[in-house]
Amino acid sequence: MIGAFKRLGQKLFLTLLTASLIFASSIVTANASIAPNFKVFVMGPLEKVTDFNAFKDQLITLKNNGVYGITTDIWWGYVENAGENQFDWSYYKTYADTVRAAGLKWVPIMSTHACGGNVGDTVNIPIPSWVWTKDTQDNMQYKDEAGNWDNEAVSPWYSGLTQLYNEFYSSFASNFSSYKDIITKIYISGGPSGELRYPSYNPSHGWTYPGRGSLQCYSKAAITSFQNAMKSKYGTIAAVNSAWGTSLTDFSQISPPTDGDNFFTNGYKTTYGNDFLTWYQSVLTNELANIASVAHSCFDPVFNVPIGAKIAGVHWLYNSPTMPHAAEYCAGYYNYSTLLDQFKASNLAMTFTCLEMDDSNAYVSPYYSAPMTLVHYVANLANNKGIVHNGENALAISNNNQAYVNCANELTGYNFSGFTLLRLSNIVNSDGSVTSEMAPFVINIVTLTPNGTIPVTFTINNATTYYGQNVYIVGSTSDLGNWNTTYARGPASCPNYPTWTITLNLLPGEQIQFKAVKIDSSGNVTWEGGSNHTYTVPTSGTGSVTITWQN
C-alpha cells in the first residue's frame, strides 16, 4: 500500500508502506478478496460451562461483533462415560439452547479423542474407560519407537473403531435433530487434538519443540498391518528383497524402522523408506475414509450440512538440512496430495492450522520452521482439487497484531471458506466484555466476511498534515479499534488535499462514535478536537459520512 503525504503545504507525495506498518491492521481489508461463503467462528471453552447466563452474554458479544458461530467439542468422555450406549446429552442440550438464544450458529466437533497433555490443554477429559476393555492394549493403542503406549485416541488398527463411532454419531443425530436450524457443519476427530494424525509429538512422552517426535507403529497390530501391506504389494519375499536390496527370508521379518534418527536422515530416501511412509500415511487415510462414511450415514439424512476434518500444521523441521520434514512424516503426513485426495473422495471439508505464523525461522536452527510456506502449499492443493478449506490459528494470539494480519493475508490470498479463532476467552471476558484482542480480530478477520459487513465511506475535510503524516479513523467499536490507535483504520487516501477518504467494512446496524486522528511515521498521534462524531451503520447497502477536522 502506498500512502499520500503533503510537503510544503502544496504537493502530494507517495511513499512506501514502511511508515504505515505500525498500523497494519487495515492493510489487508482495503482490497480484500475472499471466498463468497466465508464465515468466522470462535472455539468454545475446553472446560465445562458452569454459568450459562454468563456464557450467553459472552456469545451475544460474539454475535454483536460479527462472529457467525461457535465450535464446540462434544466430548465422548462426557456423554458416554457411564458405559457403552449409555448417553447423557443434557449438558450439550443446554449448551445448544444457549447458542440458539444468542443468535449464533453451532459447529459440533465429535471429539472421540482425549483432552489433556497437549499444547493448550487446560483440562483432562479421558476417553471413556470402558472403551479400553473392548480389546487388548496392543490392538487399541499406539506404541511408539521407545515403547510408550498412547491413549489419546483409539488406534486405527482396532477393528471395532467404526462401530464405536457409529453408536456415538447416531445418538448425537437422534438427540440433536431439533437443532438443525443452528448446526451449520459438523467436524469429526481423526486423532489427537481432534486432528487427523498420529500422536507423534506428545509432551507427556518426552517430546519438546522442535523435536521430530516418534513414529507410532510398533504394536504387534501395526507391525502386522505393515507386513500385510508389503505382502499385498510385492507378493513374494523375493520381490521385496529385489526392491529393497535386502536378504529377508519371510514377511515376518519386515518391521518399521529400528533406528528412527538414521531413517529420517537417510533411510526415508530409499525404496523401503517410501514404502514404509506411504503405508504409514495410508493407515490415516483409510481411517478417515471409514469414519467419514459413518459420519455421512449418520448425519446427512438428519442435518444435511458439510462434514469436515482437521489436518495439523506440523511446520517445524520443514527445511531441516539433516532430516527435512521428519516431524511431518512422524505425524503421518508424507504426501499431502494423496492425503487431500481422501478428503475429496470422502466429501469432507478440510481445516488447516497455523495461519497466524510466519517463516521467520525457516532456516534458523534448530527450528527450520516454515508454517507460511506449508499453509500456502496445502491451500493450493486444496484449491486445485476443489476441496473446501478453512483455517485456524494454532496457538492463542496475544498482543500480536501481525498474527491477525498473517491470518487475513492467508484467508484472502488462498480462497479459504472460513476461519476459527482459538479461543472464546481470548477475546471475551467472563462478564461478556471484550478483551483487547477483540479489536484486531474484528478489524483483520471478521470484516472480511462478504454480505456480513457494510462498506462505509468516510470523508474528512480540512485535515492538513505535514510530511510523513496520514489520517486514520478510530472509534468506539471493535471494527474501529475500541479507541485504541494501535488499531486505527487507515491510512485514508488523499485525492484532493486536504480532503481525505477511506471506505471501511463495518458491522451492519451498529451505532458508532468515532474521531479522525493523524499519525506520523514515528507513531506520534494527533487527535481531532471537539466532541466525538456519531453514526449508525446501515443494515444493508452502503453508507457514507462526511466530517470536517476539528482542531
Swiss-Prot record:
Binding sites annotated in the UniProt record for Ca(2+): E80, E167
Cofactor: Ca(2+)
Recorded superkingdom: Bacteria
Signal peptide: 1-32
EC numbers, comma separated: 3.2.1.2
A single GO molecular function term of this UniProt record: starch binding
Positions with a binding annotation for substrate: D73, H113, D121, K310, H315, T353, N393, A394, R423
GO biological process: one example: polysaccharide catabolic process
Active site: E195, E392
A Pfam family that the UniProt record links to this protein: CBM_20
Keywords tagged on the record: Carbohydrate metabolism, Glycosidase, Hydrolase, Metal-binding, Polysaccharide degradation, Signal
Domain CBM20 positions: 448-551
Catalyzed reactions: Hydrolysis of (1->4)-alpha-D-glucosidic linkages in polysaccharides so as to remove successive maltose units from the non-reducing ends of the chains
Co-factor binding comment: Binds 1 Ca(2+) ion per subunit.
SUPFAM superfamilies cross-referenced by the UniProt entry: (Trans)glycosidases
Temperature dependence comment: Optimum temperature is 75 degrees Celsius. Stable at 80 degrees Celsius.
Assigned protein family: Belongs to the glycosyl hydrolase 14 family.
Oligomeric form and interacting partners: Monomer.
Name of the protein in question: Thermophilic beta-amylase
